[in-house]
C-alpha cells in the first residue's frame, strides 16, 4: 500500500501529469507549474531594471544554490550552481596535480558515460584512470575491488551514489574510509540520488558531491551543482574561474584572487534563468522533506518490482529497497518494442540498451499508474 497519499494533492503543480502517465522522473522530472511565473519575474526585472537587475539576480542565484544544497544536507554557502556536471568535473580535474606519484582516479565501469569520458582524458595531464569493472550481473559496483584499487597513488575516487542504469544505491562509506586513509579525495555523483533518496553530505564525509537538477529535483536543464566540503575548498584552485569565481567580481581586477570556499567554482556569468526556473521545484521538495519522498517512493517501487517479477519479467535493479534508488529497471522481453508501444499508449518511461525499461514513480505518482504500466507491458507482449 502506498504511503503519504496526501502528497497527491500536489499533482496539479506538475502539469504533465494531466497529459500522460509520467513515470520518467529519473530522466526528466516534471516541471513545476510555478516555473513560468518565476521566469516571468526574471524577464520583468531585466525589462524594468536593465543592468540593475543584477542586484536581485546575483543573490537569487546563491539563494537557489543554498536551497538545492539543503536537499542533500549541505550547509549554506557550500554549494554552487553551474550549467552542467560536465563543466564541474572539468573544473575539478583542473584543480588537481596529475604529474606526481599520486596521479590516479579510481572509478567504476558502471558510471555515467560522460564522466568516464572525462576520466579517460586525465592521461593527457599525466594522470591515470583506474576503471574497476562492476559485478558480473551488471547491476552493482564491485565495492571490494574498488577499495582494493585505492592506494597511495590515488588522487581522487569518484563514483555514483545511485547507478543510472540499474538504480543501485551505492554504499560509499568503504570508499570514503579507504580514500581518506591514503590521503585521496572523494567525489560522489548524486545526480540519480538527489530528490528521491535522503542524502547528508556532511555525514557521508565526502569531499565533493556533484549533481544536476534534470531528474528527481525537477529543476530542469542548466542547473548543475557542486558541494565542496569547507575543509578542502581553499586548497582547490580551478583553472577556469570566470568573473564570478573571484573574490570581488564587480571590481574587475585583472589580478586573480579566488573567491572563498565553493564560490571559486562559480565560473563566468551564471545561468540566471535556469536558477529562477528551478526554484519552485526545489522549494516544494524542501517543504515536503526528502524523507517523506523516499518513503512514498519505496511504497510504489517495491510493488512495481514484485509485480514485474510475478509476471515473469526480468528486473535489473536490487530487490531490496534499502539498496535501490528511485527507479526500477525492467526487461519484459522485446524491450525496445514494448517501450515504443508504451509511449504510443501514453506511458512516458525510457529504455537503456542492455538492461531494459526504466520506470520511476515519484512522490506525485499514484499506485494505479504503477499497476497500469505493468498491465500495458503485459498487453503489448500478448498482442493486445
Predicted features along the sequence, with ranges:
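Pyridoxal 5′-phosphate
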Residues: 1-384
Amino acid at each position: 500500500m502506498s504511503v503519504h497519499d496526501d502528497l497527491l494533492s500536489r499533482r496539479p503543480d506538475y502539469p504533465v501529469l494531466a497529459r500522460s502517465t509520467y513515470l520518467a522522473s529519473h530522466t526528466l522530472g516534471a516541471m513545476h507549474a510555478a516555473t513560468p511565473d518565476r521566469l516571468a519575474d526574471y524577464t520583468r526585472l531585466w525589462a524594468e531594471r536593465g543592468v540593475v537587475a543584477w542586484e536581485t539576480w546575483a543573490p537569487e542565484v546563491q539563494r537557489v544554490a543554498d536551497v538545492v544544497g539543503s536537499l542533500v544536507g549541505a550547509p549554506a554557502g557550500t554549494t554552487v550552481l553551474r550549467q552542467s556536471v560536465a563543466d564541474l568535473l572539468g573544473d575539478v580535474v583542473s584543480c588537481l596535480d596529475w604529474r606526481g606519484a599520486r596521479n590516479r582516479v579510481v572509478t567504476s565501469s558502471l558510471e555515467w558515460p560522460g564522466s568516464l569520458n572525462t576520466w579517460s582524458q586525465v592521461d593527457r595531464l599525466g594522470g591515470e584512470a583506474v576503471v574497476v569493472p562492476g559485478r558480473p550481473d551488471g547491476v552493482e559496483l564491485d565495492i571490494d575491488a574498488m577499495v582494493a584499487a585505492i592506494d597511495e597513488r590515488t588522487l581522487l575516487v569518484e563514483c555514483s551514489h545511485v547507478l543510472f542504469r540499474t538504480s543501485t544505491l551505492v554504499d560509499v562509506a568503504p570508499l570514503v574510509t579507504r580514500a581518506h586513509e591514503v590521503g585521496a579525495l572523494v567525489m560522489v555523483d548524486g545526480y540519480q540520488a538527489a530528490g528521491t533518496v535522503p542524502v547528508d553530505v556532511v555525514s557521508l564525509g565526502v569531499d565533493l558531491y556533484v549533481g544536476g537538477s534534470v531528474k528527481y529535483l525537477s529543476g530542469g536543464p542548466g542547473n548543475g551543482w557542486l558541494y565542496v566540503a569547507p575543509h578542502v575548498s581553499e586548497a582547490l584552485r580551478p583553472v577556469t574561474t570566470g568573473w564570478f569565481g573571484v573574490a570581488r567580481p564587480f571590481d574587475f581586477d585583472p589580478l586573480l584572487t579566488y573567491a572563498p570556499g565553493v564560490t571559486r567554482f562559480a565560473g563566468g556569468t551564471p545561468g540566471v534563468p535556469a536558477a529562477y526556473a528551478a526554484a519552485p521545484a526545489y522549494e516544494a521538495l524542501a517543504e515536503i522533506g526528502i524523507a517523506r519522498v523516499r518513503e512514498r517512493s519505496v511504497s510504489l517501487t517495491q510493488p512495481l518490482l514484485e509485480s514485474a517479477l510475478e509476471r515473469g519479467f526480468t528486473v535489473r535493479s536490487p530487490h531490496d529497497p534499502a539498496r535501490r534508488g528511485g527507479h526500477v529497471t525492467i526487461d519484459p522481453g522485446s524491450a525496445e518494442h514494448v517501450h515504443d508501444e508504451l509511449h504510443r499508449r501514453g506511458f512516458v518511461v525510457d529504455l537503456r540498451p542492455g538492461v531494459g525499461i526504466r520506470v520511476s514513480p515519484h512522490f506525485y505518482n499514484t499506485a494505479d499508474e504503477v499497476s497500469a504500466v505493468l498491465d500495458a507491458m503485459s498487453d503489448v507482449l500478448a498482442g493486445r
